[in-house]
């Protein structure tokens, strides 16, 4: 048992050693890989990015600005010369002292050439030597430009005015002072062309005088811009004003006066008035009694009826309290009868059918109102319409009307209409 047990124990020890060794190897492998990854990331961050070939070619090719750039004085390209002297500069190259010196020398040459150019020009801005290229000069189109250029040439000799820029600035300021708007510009040019060269004060004063009336020698466009358009506007405004006044008159015209419609029983006032005059002239009681005893009949029932009797039936009303004999002045039209009733206070609309008399009642002054007594004696001859209105007022006041010794009870409108065939006295409404 002894040697066998020792062999088993040694085998177990070897197995444990192998297991521990393998675990240590695996741990070391993972540790080494982790460290390698860390180092690789550090190297990538420290190393500069490598550009591709296409990118390098694009960076090395000179740009269009370098190829076609010109200096202020020379007509040749300076970029090509500098590239030939210094060579092609690539990314990352360090300029040497020689290259910096050449660049400084080139910059000094440019400065001296600019100064020489300024010296070559005289005080008026014109070049002393012949230039191969000159800008064309625009000829003056009108007399105003000639005046302004002459004034600018006179002011060139001043101490503060040197060079073309100041001259142009002075002339532009004078133009702005003389000509402020389009219409003044057109008038200034035409005025100078007609009258010749003149002062600025004269031209401005003439402009103010010529604003209202056009000159005969002006062109069509100037007249259209300043005169004809205003005429058209005035013409259209006048036409609109005339139309507007006509429309206003039509709108403000009062409504037509309504036509007065007479009562059905008073549609023949003239014939009724003639009958009353005939009755007053004849003075016969039998004839008037016949008129009063008429009830509405036709010729078939009574063939002895005349035209006057028939017209009296349809144009007369039987009313109690009226006498058959009436003088001529008492038989008046409904309008005159209603006009005589202006003194009655607070008359209802049903008391008189005349609309105009109702309106005139309120328009008249109290001095012109002819007041009438509230009650009349039986011997007096009342007017027909006044009696009808007085009867209605008495009905409202509940005062009994006594006529010819008979007591007339209070009656309604229907009863008064029914009494038209029964009463004996004929009156006119």
From Swiss-Prot:
Topology with respect to the bilayer: Single-pass type III membrane protein
Segments passing through the bilayer: 18-38
Entry's Gene Ontology cellular component terms: membrane raft; plasma membrane
Subcellular location: Cell membrane
Residues with PTM Phosphotyrosine: 107, 165, 183, 224, 314, 356, 386, 414
Side Extracellular, residues: 1-17
Name of the protein: Phosphoprotein associated with glycosphingolipid-enriched microdomains 1
Organism: Mus musculus (Mouse)
Upper classification of the organism: Eukaryota, Metazoa, Chordata, Craniata, Vertebrata
């Amino acid at each position: 048992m002894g040697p066998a047990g020792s062999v088993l124990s040694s085998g177990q020890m070897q197995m444990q050693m192998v297991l521990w060794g393998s675990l240590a190897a695996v741990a070391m492998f993972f540790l080494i890989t982790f460290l390698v990854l860390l180092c690789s990331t550090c190297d990538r961050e420290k190393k500069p990015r490598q550009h591709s070939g296409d990118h390098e070619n694009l960076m090395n090719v000179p740009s269009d600005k370098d190829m076609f750039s010109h200096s202020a004085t020379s007509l040749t390209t300076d970029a090509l010369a500098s590239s030939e002297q210094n060579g092609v500069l690539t990314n990352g190259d360090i300029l040497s002292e020689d290259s910096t010196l050449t660049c400084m020398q080139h910059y000094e040459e440019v400065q001296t050439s600019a100064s020489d150019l300024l010296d070559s020009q005289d005080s008026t801005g014109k070049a002393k030597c012949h230039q191969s290229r000159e800008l064309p000069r625009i000829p003056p189109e009108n007399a105003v430009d000639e005046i302004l250029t002459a004034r600018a040439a006179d002011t060139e000799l001043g101490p503060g005015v040197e060079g073309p820029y100041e001259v142009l600035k002075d002339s532009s300021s004078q133009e702005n002072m003389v000509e402020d708007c389009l219409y003044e510009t057109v008038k200034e040019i035409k005025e100078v062309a007609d009258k010749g060269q003149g002062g600025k004060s004269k031209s401005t004063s003439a402009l103010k005088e010529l604003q209202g009336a056009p000159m005969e020698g002006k062109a069509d466009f100037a007249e259209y811009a300043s005169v004809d358009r205003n005429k058209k506007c005035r013409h259209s405004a006048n036409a609109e004003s005339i139309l507007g006044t006509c429309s206003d008159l039509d709108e403000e015209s009062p409504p037509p006066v309504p036509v007065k419609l007479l009562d059905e029983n008073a549609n023949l006032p003239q014939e009724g008035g003639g009958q009353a005059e005939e009755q007053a002239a004849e003075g016969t009681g039998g004839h008037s009694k016949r008129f009063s005893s008429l009830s509405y009949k036709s010729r078939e029932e009574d063939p002895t009826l005349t035209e006057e009797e028939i017209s009296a039936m349809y144009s007369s009303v039987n009313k109690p309290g009226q006498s058959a004999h009436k003088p001529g002045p008492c038989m008046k039209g409904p309008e005159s009868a209603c006009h005589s009733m202006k003194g009655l206070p607070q008359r209802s609309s049903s008391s008189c059918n005349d609309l105009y008399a109702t309106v005139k009642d309120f328009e008249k002054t109290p001095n012109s109102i002819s007041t009438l007594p509230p009650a009349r004696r039986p011997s007096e001859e009342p007017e027909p319409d006044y009696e009808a209105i007085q009867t209605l007022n008495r009905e409202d006041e509940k005062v009994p009307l006594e006529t010819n010794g008979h007591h007339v009870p209070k009656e309604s409108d229907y009863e008064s209409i029914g009494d038209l065939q029964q009463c004996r006295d004929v009156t006119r409404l």
